[in-house]
Structures are given as C-alpha cells and as structure tokens.
Design a protein with these regions (language model features):
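A feature for the membrane-embedded catalytic helix bundles of lipid/isoprenoid biosynthetic enzymes
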Residues: 2-10, 14-16, 21-22, 27, ...
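Conserved hydrophobic/amphipathic secondary-structure segments
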Residues: 56
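Short hydrophobic/aromatic, small-residue-rich stretches within specific transmembrane helices
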Residues: 33-41
Length: 190
C-alpha cells in the first residue's frame, strides 16, 4: 500500500466510522456526530482530488475508497433507521426504512458484483463511474442534513434530509441498474 496523502485520507475515513457510531450511540452532541460525518464526506472528495492532482492514484486507493464510503454510509443509515427518535419524526417511517434497505442492499450487491467481475477479469465493466460518484455525494449530503436536523430537530431540515435521502435512493437504484446492465453480457454467459 503506497502511503500517499490520498490513501491516508481514505484510511482516516475508515477510522472515523467507529468514532461516528460511538458518538451517536452514547448520545453525544448531535452536532459533533454530524460534523464528523461531514468531515468524512470532505475526505471522500479530497482523497480523489488529491490522488488525481498529485498523480498518486493507486490500486489500493481505488479499492478502499468506495469500500470506505459504503461502510460509513451503511453504518450511519442503520443508526438512523434504528433510532425511534428519527423514525417517529420523518414523513414516512416505512418509506424511510425501505430506502435505507435499498441503499444498503445496493451497496452489498454492487460490491459482490465487482468482486465477481474481478474474478472473471472484467472489473472495468463495473468500475466507479460518474453516476456512482453523484450517488455517493447525494447520500453523504442527505445523511449530513439528516444528522444536523436531528441534532436540532428542525422540521424543515429534517424534511429536506428525508427528501434528499429519497432522491439518493432513486439514484442508488438507477446506478445499480446501470452497473447490472453493463455486467449482464458476462453474467448471462455464466
């Protein structure tokens, strides 16, 4: 593993996961939880930018970056969906939980698909593209707004966060279909 600034930022994002979860669960400051999650989102942008700008792209970074995103997003979505204080305040607790399940299910499905395509020597078919990057950005934005809204329990921000999450869920499904469509020729041969 090359120890580049970009890879260090990605590792920092992974290290932030248990910190964000712990702060949330011990009932620490909601603003601290939201701020730490926002920091993780900034490292997601910064690691990619720096890797390209400094010509420090690596196989390790290409592997770990999306894994770090999926772990952070999934961990916090589980916290939010399992928190009665959150689910009692959203417009539709059932839809909220379904969208969380869709997002996490897609992340697992596409991770497995990438692994399988790599086994077949076709990893490029499911490489992270612009749609996946927009999806991840929207997920981070939605969750950040939800965390800040929950910290202050401000209804307009909570509604905005929920609507952003639904948009992220739709984009998540769209990106999954795009990846599956790209991999379908290889899948149908097996």
């Amino acid at each position: 593993m090359p120890l580049t600034i970009a890879n260090i930022l990605t590792l920092l994002r992974v290290a932030l996961i248990p910190v964000v979860v712990a702060v949330y669960l011990i009932g620490g400051s909601g603003y601290l939880t939201a701020g730490l999650f926002l920091l993780a989102g900034v490292t997601d942008w910064a690691d990619g930018y720096l890797a390209r700008k400094r010509n420090e792209q690596s196989a390790f970074g290409a592997f770990l970056d999306p894994v770090a995103d999926k772990l952070m997003v999934s961990a916090v979505l589980v916290l939010l969906a399992a928190d009665p204080e959150m689910t009692q305040r959203v417009l539709s607790p059932v839809l909220f939980t379904i969208v969380v399940a869709i997002i996490i299910g897609r992340e697992i499905t596409i991770s497995a698909l990438r692994e399988w395509m790599a086994e077949l020597g076709n990893r490029g078919v499911v490489a992270v593209g612009w749609l996946g990057k927009i999806k991840t950005t929207l997920q981070f934005l939605a969750i950040t707004v939800l965390l800040f809204a929950q910290a202050g329990m401000q209804a307009p921000a909570l509604i905005l966060g929920e609507l952003l999450l639904y948009a992220a869920g739709a984009l998540t499904l769209w990106s999954m279909m795009a990846y599956l469509k790209g991999a379908w020729p290889m899948l149908s041969e097996r």
